[in-house]
Amino acid sequence: MVAITVQGAQLIKRVVERFYPGIAFDINEGACYIYKFSDHIRRIRMKHGTKYRRQAEEIMRSISLRKERLYGIPVLDEVEWKYVFDGQTFQSYAFEVYVNSILPWSELDPEEEFLRNYRVSRETTEVEKFIEFRAKNEMQIYGDIPIKVWCCFINELSIELNPIPLGMQVMADFVNRFNSPFHQGNRDLSNLEDFQVAYTTPLLFEMCCMESILEFNIKMRMREEDISALEFGDIKIDPVGLLREFFILCLPHPKKINNVLRAPYSWFVKMWGVGADPIVVLQSTAGDDRNSKDVFYDKFRTEPNRYKALFRSSFYNESRRMNEEKILEAVKYSQNLGSHDRRLPLFEKMLKMVYTTPFYPHKSSNMILASFLLSIQTITGYGRAWVKNVSTEFDKQLKPNPSNLVRDVSDLTREFFKQAYVEAKERREEMVKPEDLYTSMLRLARNTSSGFSTEIYVKKRFGPRLRDKDLVKINSRIKALVIFTKGHTVFTDEELHKKYNSVELYQTKGSRDVPIKATRTIYSINLSVLVPQLIVTLPLNEYFSRVGGITRPDYKKIGGKVIVGDLEATGSRVMDAADCFRNSADRDIFTIAIDYSEYDTHLTRHNFRTGMLQGIREAMAPYRALRYEGYTLEQIIDFGYGEGRVANTLWNGKRRLFKTTFDAYIRLDESERDKGSFKVPKGVLPVSSVDVANRIAVDKGFDTLIAATDGSDLALIDTHLSGENSTLIANSMHNMAIGTLIQRAVGREQPGILTFLSEQYVGDDTLFYTKLHTTDITVFDKVAASIFDTVAKCGHEASPSKTMMTPYSVEKTQTHAKQGCYVPQDRMMIISSERRKDIEDVQGYVRSQVQTMITKVSRGFCHDLAQLILMLKTTFIGAWKMKRTIKENAMYRDRKFDSNDEDGFTLIQIRNPLALYVPIGWNGYGAHPAALNIVMTEEMYVDSIMISKLDEIMAPIRRIVHDIPPCWNETQGDKRGLISATKLSFFSKMARPAVQAALSDPQIMNLVEELPLGEFSPGRISRTMMHSALLKESSAKALLSSGYRLEYQKALNGWIAQVSMRLGEESGVISTSYAKLFDVYFEGELDGAPYMFPDQNLSPQFYIQKMMIGPRVSSRVRNSYVDRIDVILRKDVVMRGFITANTILNVIEKLGTNHSVGDLVTVFTLMNIETRVAEELAEYMTSEKIRFDALKLLKKGIAGDEFTMSLNVATQDFIDTYLAYPYQLTKTEVDAISLYCTQMVMLRAALGLPKKKMKIVVTDDAKKRYKIRLQRFRTHVPKIKVLKKLIDPNRMTVRNLENQFV
């Protein structure tokens, strides 16, 4: 087996050579530079009268002959589409299916959810302009590297792995017959142009790439597990066949067909083998409550299935029949559209035997198949849909009457709301007090749209004739910016009394793309509506996101039953869902999980809103006396939820489109063709109102699209809006009300048949663990009917095909558990992304990609393939960042204006793929080739060179470790370019007393400036907060980043000079100045039986770690220093998004750790941190006297990924088992050491080396160096002392400031 670093580097080298033919890419150099040429700037400047000696055509001819060089660096073109696949052809059937499904534009249904494959014709009609407009939005791939690079990668990989995946065959056939499918920009990946053949080619290519990757992945996984086929029970199944039948069926209309098939595939995995007898489970034991997370896994065992008779009941037959019908529907639809005769033979055969075919969790052939069926669905990418803007259907709403439960469910919702407020108050969570009104608004300062718009001015910093006064106005709707600039106007009479129910005053819908499912609508509710909501619902949000508890139905507190927010998220699925694994292995547990369809739209004023508001009003009664800018809480509730605020509001979304003929349109009166204030999409003509449109609409033979422009197609909505501040909690409370009624009904109609042991509600997900005391089919059918009947009487819909009532199988928030094991579903996209990625910090971004890949591998992706993909991304991400940069004689500079030699040339920097494995501190991305979840720190690098088993893997890395140039990082750029002409008016209301004191007194300000507070010193903090918000606004970002380019050139120029200094005489030898903080000695071997764990579908590199180290036993982590700081910072509502633990650590690193509590409180309050939080922080930081550079170790992100969090590392138990250390170390120092040892233990496990105990000795050298640092830090102490006196709250000026709100 060739080392992955050698094989991968060679593979990516070939990809680069395929993408840029003629490049000389040396695998032993840190980066490779080439130029690209574009004649765009020359054309523009020639219009302005610039004369060039050489014509652009001549330069381009010379480039295509590969003769063009600039300052010794070659100028190259990227490969043309037709050569990407070397002209291979496959005559694949799938390609014909796609071509057959292409429709002419006359077939268009303008409001179809997903665009079908429409032909690109020669003459562009208005209708086609509309299709293209939709395609440019809905076919987006985004992602982080161009799709053509993916195609080169897939081609190279298929040469290595053959046979050739179907996706690649289809692409090769396409470029062979039609040449280029579309054009995509390299710098801006959202730039799609020149569609050829059909408007869906980008989606086709994304699908083909994804299909190929899934084929490679399953082949490589099977090779790792050493199996030749997957198995359904004992029947052999070919996974590639399964994937290909699904892929071909989807081609005619991918997202639509996938959407129909999604449910049957998931349902199949959940129900596979639940009726098999005997049945194999992974036995485990745990605490008393059914939601207990302390689970111990024991062993696999076979037991008789006492439920086997149940599966003949009509509920199960009906359930399977509905899923079979869905498949039939998808097959017929696909066959008609693509005129083919393919079905899903393999899957249909499996579906017939789903209940009784056994699922063997201990056989990887079964486990991989289950996981594979869940991840197949990612091939069609994100569901970017055209969401119709429809009003609430009032006549369909269930009104309260004695025969239904609408009133009961509303009353229960009211009672649960009241109870929630009582429980929250017991935990000291109360509503926002009037004096905290403005400060609390900052909780809403997220980077999402707000429904308001604001103006900000930014300095322009680039151009041939630049004056100082060039300010560019930027309009933004981002919440954070709106709050900073207009926060003081949100809570005024005028805003609070606006009613959003007219054509003049309405609100706007946003949307979120989710993989596979259709687009979700998001209501971006106006800020002046959100603030009153925040005042009353804040205690509930806080209480439920912090509190856990018992989930037994007879237990009166609801805190544990509503699971919201971070409460269960330790960051690792395997830990969070421990209760699912344990319950799915327990023969006594029967699980009921109800799936509501369209939950939000069924939350009407009858069954929900009335009860919710009554509950809130009654809970607010004790606070009658409070006044918010003069308003009572009664009024506040009305401003947050009343008529025209949330109830009965008008929303602007997509226009309603109608088909008509151009003749009919021309014959309209001029007044009827009037343009109102609402814009129509491209290629659509305006008419005055919906009535006019309806009058001339035709169904057949249309040639024109029209839409109303007077707002008569706004949607009137009265149901619950996702986007309200209380969405998740309100949903869960109402859900609990339905759940309670279900329990009552079942208990009344079928007494003693079903005992409810646990209830859990998350939004619209309901999960009951119950005990079933019968296997009588007729009785069971009655119980099922009773449940569906109750749901219907509450005014909701539950679908039998998706609702699960089963033993041995549990699904909770997308985590599937079967027979005690975890069936991971890997739905994380690799190629596409939800939105356009503007990568500001390349290093940070690739690091996060490594984290994503670790999560993918922990969900069954192949470890080697993950590394290859990461190396591909390492090489190309950030390659096209430099604009107008020229490299001349090893110096980087901007190109000259209007220069014959330089205009139109741009430098491209292609990194060495092995930079992935170089430590972050040396400009790499810090992954480790032996196992991705190990972070390659500088220490780890030194240790890895010493391990002989790693010699072959480390050899290629050693050659380039010193040669990686700095990464692009705009966030480090200069923030002074930002002049918000709107000086943060709101900041004065938000700033805390210490900061206000500093801002108002120059003497204090001068002293403060000498402290190392960086971006967070009082003078800069408002600008820092604005800047981080502005970076989310693309128009502003372009202006800010152009200034960063010069700084990046400086960094490159500075870096070249440093190499010789930074390393010893010979490259790769690290000089002695790099000494360790402590010495580690390996002592006796530890032995133990291999561990059992629920996530069996892992690549060997991860599997072996888990087997040797074992799963983490409890969800209680030994909180590291950094986590603890983050927890404390989270209590500061204003600054928590802006200041992170790393910010604090950086300040402390410069200040030193041995200051008194009081001194540190002063420093923190100057960073606008609330006094209470500052005190807690200071106390925590001084309680841990750190005696050497432990902080350096704590900032590397070790053990922070999803997989490592499920291992038994860095816990107290781990420290006791593996470490022997001097008793005088503090907890933080032990933390630092345990992180270092964690990495060593994981590395040794991944390499298959035996487990050993480690002995730690702190070196004298480290103690000496610490003493020297102390001297250096003492210099800051006097300044802080003086400052403390100056901003002492007892001085009059500050006191006046503090009283201004009273």
From Swiss-Prot:
InterPro entries in the cross-refs: DNA/RNA_pol_sf, RNA-dir_pol_reovirus, RNA_pol_orbivir
Domain RdRp catalytic: 562-823
EC number, UniProt record: 2.7.7.48
Annotated GO biological process: DNA-templated transcription; viral genome replication
GO molecular function: nucleotide binding; RNA binding; RNA-directed RNA polymerase activity
Database matches in Pfam families: Orbi_VP1
Catalytic activity entry: RNA(n) + a ribonucleoside 5'-triphosphate = RNA(n+1) + diphosphate
Entry keywords, A to Z: Nucleotide-binding, Nucleotidyltransferase, RNA-directed RNA polymerase, Transferase, Viral RNA replication
Nucleotide-binding keyword on record: yes
Coiled-coil parts of chain: none
Keyword Nucleotide-binding: yes
Record-stated family: Belongs to the reoviridae RNA-directed RNA polymerase family.
Protein name per the record: RNA-directed RNA polymerase
Organism: Bluetongue virus 10 (isolate USA) (BTV 10)
